Amino acid sequence: PIGGQTLKKRLCDMDYVVKHRSDQCCVTINYPAALSGRYDIVESECRAMHTEFDAALHIIDIVPATLFSAKELIAVGQAIAAGGGYHLKVNPGYGLGSTFEELSLLKRVFGEQFILDPSGGIRELKDVAEYVRRGFTVIHSQKTFPFIEEFRILKERGGHLNV
């Protein structure tokens, strides 16, 4: 479910996911509300989704972090946490690309309160190594399979990721 959809539509999509036996669902926050400073809406919608589906799904709240200033991103994180969120996927798609700065800010402010997944714009194995060095354990990229192959070749040649 994407953030521009109504809450009702996102809940229906999540119900569909549960009925088809998935155990995980990524849901984009209502970023138009967040961009308007309506963090109360982000919080209430997150609460509705997590209350309804946390027992059946591992919910990953998607945050297009690059759209927000640092202050706004912190407010978004607070709203998601207050709404029951615990796992954030940062900047997937939309050509936004994750940045070390955004993820470091979220990690610094929220500590272990969230599982944080960088996503989007991760195009080089050295970027993966840097995220791993910074403590991130799940990294999303369209280049996952090429990274695996590149890492396999690196290991065969006796090399390793510099983390």
In which residue ranges do the predicted regions lie?
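Glycine-rich phosphate-binding active-site loops on the catalytic face of alpha/beta enzymes
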Residues: 1-4, 20-34, 82-99, 120-124, ...
